[in-house]
Amino acid sequence: MNAQTLSQSGSTTISNSDNKKWAIVGGGMLGLTLAMRMAKQGHDVTLIEAAPVLGGLASVWNLGDIVWDRHYHVTLLSDSRLRNLISELGLEDKMKWVETKTGFYTDGKFYSMSDTKEFLSFPPLNLIEKLRLGGTIFYASKIKNWKRLEKITVEKWLRRWSGNSVFEKIWEPLLKCKLGEAYRKTAASFIWAHTSRMYKARRTGLKKEMFGYVEGGYRTIIESMEQELKSLGVTIKTGCPTSKVEKGSDGQFTVEYANEESADKFDRVIMTTPNAILERVCTDLSAQEKQKFSNVNYLGIVCASLLLKKPLSVYYVTNLTDDWVPMTAVIEMTTIVDPKELGGNSLVYLPKYIPAEHEMFDKTDDEVKESFLAALERMYPDFTRDDVLAFEISRVRNVMAIPTLRYSESLPEMNTSVDGLYIVNSSYILKGNLNVNESITIAEDALDTVLKTELQAT
C-alpha cells in the first residue's frame, strides 16, 4: 500500500513502499524532469532514451571546435519553473542576463522593434495600424480565459482586432513563416500563448527585453540533471530506441528495444515521446486513443547552426516577413551568449518550421545549405561565405503540436485505458507554446495527475 503525503508545493506524493519499477521513455527535458521528481520521492526509475545522449530538443552537439545547443533556447525572466530548476541544480550563479533587441526584415529592409519609440516609428505601418497592432498585443497579454480562444481561428481573431491591413502586412507573413499553411486551422490560443510569454518578459524595469542563458548552454543543465539522477539511483539507458511497450497477463509491462534482443520489465510506464512514436510502440492502446493521438498535427523543424567569424546583426531575433526568405527567423545567439564561450566567434541559428511531411526533410544538407547561405548573402551585404567556420543541420519531424480549434477538448487522458500506462508529452501543452519552461511545467503538473491515479488504484 502506498502512503500519501503532501509536498511543500501542495502536490501529491506517494512513497514507493510496494517497490514498483517505473520506466520513463524519452530523455528530453520533460522526461528528465519527471525522472528527477519521481526519484526524489523514492521511486525506482529507469529513464530510456533512443539517442546516444540525453536532452532531446535541448541536446548538444559539436559545431566546429565548440560544443553547444543543437537548437536555439533562451530563458525569460518569467520562466519560473525553469529558473527554479536551475536554482535547484545549484546553477543560479552561472545564469547570465542580457538586454536584447528585436529586428524585422520586411520589403528587403531591416527595422528595429525593440522599444516603444522604435515601434511608433516603424515605417511599414501607419499610425492607426500601429495602434491596432499594439492594442492587439496588449489585449492578448491580459486575456485569462484562454479556452475561448480555442473556438476561433488565429486568422479570424487577428483580423478582428488588428485589422486586415496589419494582418496582411505583419501577422500573416509571420504565421506562414512559423506554421506554413497550417496557420489557417490554428486556434487563436496560439498567438495568445506566444504574446503573453513575451509580454511577461518585458514587465520589469523599463520594458526592456532581458533574456538569459546558463554558462555552457544546455550542456551544463543536462549534465547537472544527469548527475543528480545518478545520485538518486536512477538507471539511465541511452542509445535504446523503444520498439514495443506491452502489458502482460502478470500485470507487468515488457519494454523492447529496436537494437537489443533483450527486454526489460516494469510495473508502470510513462511515455514522453511524440504521438507518432507512442502510437506505433504502445500496442495496447485502444483504437479510439490511437485515433485521438493521430489527429494531432505536428510541426517539424529544419534548423541550421552556423559558426561565423563575425556577427550578422545586433538583433537576437530577426522576424522575417518577405515570403522569398527560406527561413522562419534569424537568431543571432551571440547577442546573448558571450563570444568567449564560442572561441571568439558568432553563433547563428536559421530555423525553418514545417509540417512533418514537408519536402524539405528530403532535401540534402547541401541543398538546404545553399538555399540558406544564398538568402543570407541577399539579406546581409557584408556577409560572405568565407565567414562560415562551421555549418550543421538538425532535422526533427515531430517538434510542436499545432493547437487547432477546440484542441484541449480533443486530447485523450494522460492516464490511458491501459492501467499503469501514462502519456505525458508536449502535445499536452495547452497554456503556452513549446519551450523548455513549458516542458518542465507539463512534467511537474502531470506528475500530480499520475500519482493521484496511482493512489486511487490502491
Named regions from a protein language model:
Residues 39-63:
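Glycine-rich FAD pyrophosphate-binding loop
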Residues 2, 41, 241-348, 353-362, ...:
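Mid-domain catalytic core of redox enzymes
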Residues 1-22, 40-41:
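Extreme N-terminal leader/targeting segments of oxidoreductases
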Residues 348-349, 414-432, 438, 442:
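Short FAD-binding loop at a beta-strand-to-alpha-helix junction that anchors the flavin cofactor
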Residues 439-458:
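Internal hydrophobic alpha-helix adjacent to the cofactor/substrate pocket in enzyme cavities
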Residues 64-146, 173:
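Dinucleotide-binding Rossmann-like beta1-alpha1 core, especially the glycine-rich loop
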Residues 20-47:
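N-terminal Rossmann-like FAD-binding beta1-loop-alpha1 element of flavoenzymes
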Residues 17, 135-248, 265:
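Active-site/ligand-binding neighborhood in enzyme catalytic cores
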